[in-house]
């Protein structure tokens, strides 16, 4: 056997037994410090929850619900200003989301309805907004969410309203027109679609999902699965449940749905755009009081008079006062042919003087107008 010697320099690391002992000692010392810190954190958390429950009792006497999204936004903003790192602001927000959720759960039994089944994007948005400490009710369709809140079976409902690539969720818009519910919060959720199936990619003949999800993956489907049948169903999670029992069927949904229903993931990140975000609304029976330190967005619906310049006249009260219109969208009213509702979002709250004046003038310029709700601009 020949031995070959290299001229390359050799770097040797010498770790003595003493070094190992010192490192182990330091490790144990750090763990003891963390244990002590955890002990203090738990004491402070219980103290915080006790104070929150005291506030809850005062709210109960006043007939005010413990959930207050505007106040929560103030808390999250203050927390961000307190922290210099290394904890990220998003992580800090997530931690306190659960702390606040646990506090609310001790103050009152609250039920949140959402478009089910479990693991839909709407479910994820609801948990992002309310935390995991509250009770959730999965409902089969968007109208059922509205009905559950209207009947009192749920305290709040979470529904999708628009997507950054596919636009409005028309079912939600239509229901907002006739419902007495009001919007009290908004939630933004980044959407990452995955393909699930019990079959291999080349054996798939049908893809099921929510209609919006199918549209958001149209380019990928056209290239990777040309000619397959695209079948819309009530939700992304329902599609995963169905593909589990049907051979040759695939589903488009979020990663969580595949994990919960135990269906293999074939492809991930199949949405046509990486910046795919869905906006959700939280609806309730009663509006929440305005907080002066909070920036608000307000939603309303209107229909125009049948006259020249009707739309310009309707929007004039906002432009004259420098009120920013965040969104305007038309939708057939379904009351008569070629009659449209216009859904408008603007920056501000009706209790602000200039907004109140604009709304009074708007009422005279329109055939019909109704406020749908005011809510914190920031949102989750």
Task: Cite the ranges covered by each PLM segment.
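Domain-level signature for soluble enzymes in the chorismate/prephenate branch of the shikimate pathway
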Residues: 17-380
